[in-house]
Amino acid sequence: MIIGIGSDLIDIRRVAEVIERHGDRFLNRIFTEAERAKAERRAKNEKMVVATYAKRFAAKEACSKALGTGIRHGVWWRDMGVVNLPGGRPTMQLTGGAAERLKALTPAGHDARIDLSITDDWPLAQAFVIISAVSLATS
């Protein structure tokens, strides 16, 4: 059963402006170490670096909406990180207040699953998050 849906659309140029203005202070406040490492591996192409950050920013916004909190009520930027599953599919890894909120949303006898779709087409980046409760009972 679906327990949360969130989406976000962001102008990649806005993210570029914020990075230009605030640099590491912004990057350290918003992104996990794994997210920063992924973006910096694309350092040969500045547009790809910024698009990578923008997609992850949009994913965090979408996830916070799916959690029903936004970026408040104990859910902070670095509590949510985009990671890739072994096959390459992106998902969200939650810690801290975001993980606590997810646990509170998940009904007893269920596990939470977070599905994430991220994309970019200059100058826009988009993310869509669906949080589902999957029954632990076997068929």
From Swiss-Prot:
Pfam families: ACPS. GO terms for cellular component: cytoplasm. The keyword Lipid metabolism applies. Disulfide bonds: none annotated. Its main location: cytoplasm. Its EC number is 2.7.8.7. Coiled coil: none annotated. Gene3D superfamilies: 4'-phosphopantetheinyl transferase domain (3.90.470.20). Its cofactor is Mg(2+). It is an enzyme of class 2 (transferase). Mg(2+) binds at D8, E61. Transmembrane segments: none annotated. It is found in: Cytoplasm. Keywords: Cytoplasm, Fatty acid biosynthesis, Fatty acid metabolism, Lipid biosynthesis, Lipid metabolism, Magnesium, Metal-binding, Transferase. It catalyses: apo-[ACP] + CoA = holo-[ACP] + adenosine 3',5'-bisphosphate + H(+). The keyword Signal does not apply. One of its GO terms (biological process) is fatty acid biosynthetic process. Signal peptide: none annotated. GO terms for molecular function: holo-[acyl-carrier-protein] synthase activity; magnesium ion binding. Transfers the 4'-phosphopantetheine moiety from coenzyme A to a Ser of acyl-carrier-protein. Belongs to the P-Pant transferase superfamily. AcpS family. This is Holo-[acyl-carrier-protein] synthase. It comes from Bradyrhizobium sp. (strain BTAi1 / ATCC BAA-1182). The gene is acpS.
